[in-house]
Regions:
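C-terminal motif of bacterial Sec signal peptides marking the signal peptidase cleavage site
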Residues: 18-21
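Pocket-flanking alpha-helical
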Residues: 45, 65-98, 176-181, 197-201
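Ligand-binding cleft/hinge of the Venus flytrap
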Residues: 48-56, 131-166
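Short helix-initiation/N-cap motifs at beta->coil->alpha
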Residues: 38-39, 60-72, 167-177
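A conserved helix-loop-strand patch within extracytoplasmic ligand-binding domains
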Residues: 98-146
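Bacterial N-terminal signal peptides that target proteins for export
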Residues: 1-8
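Ligand-binding pocket segment of bilobal, Venus flytrap-like solute-binding proteins
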Residues: 79-82, 149-201
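Short, well-ordered beta-strand elements
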Residues: 27-40, 48, 57-62, 137-141
Length: 201
């Protein structure tokens, strides 16, 4: 049974993409895959690693934040990144580096980002957040600062006049905070996205 719900889908019908650095001739049996510390990215990356290794490739995994990932791919220091949220969430990175990257395909169509609360929380929309500021301690628990969802949440705070502070953390820290709050039946609002395993717990 799901224990959380999305109260504000800031972007709907996003596409999760894979891209590679331009100019790869495909002859090398070595490949480096960059990934951010997000659950779906870790899963996809390790699955890809196993598949590449089964095909005889020597695979190197590179964990980093988004800005270094895009820089590394554009400079051919890494070959593949499988967790690009388009068209809006990572738009700025694609504008900056897109001419040096090659999109090779969609992984998931219909991705969403937004704000997430436990299902026992009695609000159902972003407009209701200010009225319950004290119960949420005036905080939205986010992930790493360079993530597109953080920029989108900052914009939502302005657009909806939310009297909240967006807290920077990480994907694992955000889900740990969510679990801790659910275990205590505390009110919490976090940045969230689908697909993500937290919606299936």
């Amino acid at each position: 049974m799901n224990k959380i719900k999305m109260i504000a889908a800031m972007f709907i019908a996003g596409i999760l993409l894979t891209f590679v650095s331009c100019g790869d001739n495909g002859k090398s049996k070595k490949i480096s895959i960059a990934y951010a510390n997000w659950s779906e990215g870790i899963a996809m990356t390790n699955l890809a690693k196993a598949i590449f290794e089964d095909q005889g490739y020597d695979v190197k995994l590179l964990n980093a934040d988004l800005a270094p990932i895009f820089t590394s791919i554009s400079r051919k220091k890494a070959d593949v990144f499988m967790d690009v949220w388009m068209p809006v969430t990572m738009e700025d990175y694609m504008k900056q580096y897109g001419d040096k990257l090659e999109v090779i395909g969609d992984i998931y169509d219909g991705a969403r980002i937004g704000l997430v609360v436990p299902d026992y929380v009695t609000i159902n929309s972003i407009e209701e957040l200010n009225a319950e500021k004290e119960r949420f301690s005036g905080q939205i628990v986010g992930i790493d600062a360079g993530a597109g969802i953080m920029k989108a949440t900052d914009q939502a705070i302005k657009d909806y006049g939310l009297d909240y502070k967006l807290m920077t953390s990480s994907g694992p820290a955000m889900t740990a905070s969510l679990k801790k709050a659910i275990d205590k039946k505390d009110w919490i609002v976090v940045t969230g996205w689908t697909p993500h395993w937290m919606f299936d717990r």
